[in-house]
Amino acid sequence: MAEERNNGHKWTMIVDLDKCTGCQACVVACHAENNVPVSSEDEVIRGRANHWIRIERYWEGEYPNVKARFLPVFCQQCGNAPCEPVCPVYASYHSTEENINIQVYNRCVGTRYCGNNCPYRVRIFNYWAPRFDEPLEQQLNPDVT
């Protein structure tokens, strides 16, 4: 039904791995588009950093001809997403209009079931209320809860 509304189209993001330099510009863009707050150094040390895209680094070749390869890992917008049915308050659900996985932040009660069920480990729990200092609050996306 959702694919009928979208003419059979599904959303995804394509990355040319031969051109990826690991610069993390995609991570910054994702934070800006989805109102994800920047994590402090302390949060990163505690393993509580908010990031929806992570960049995996792999080494290829042997010394002295070693090359770093980067693999961005992000939400795959699964058609039958394992993160959706486990949420007891339906904070994680599949939009039938856009055919994408959506999370309603202010509905989340923090069970973290969605993060535990995500095979790509991109669902995270926001441990603190998001804080955007001036002038960062001016850039928030009004279409995101």
Which residues does each predicted region cover?
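Non-ligating segments of multi-cofactor redox enzymes
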Residues: M1-T145
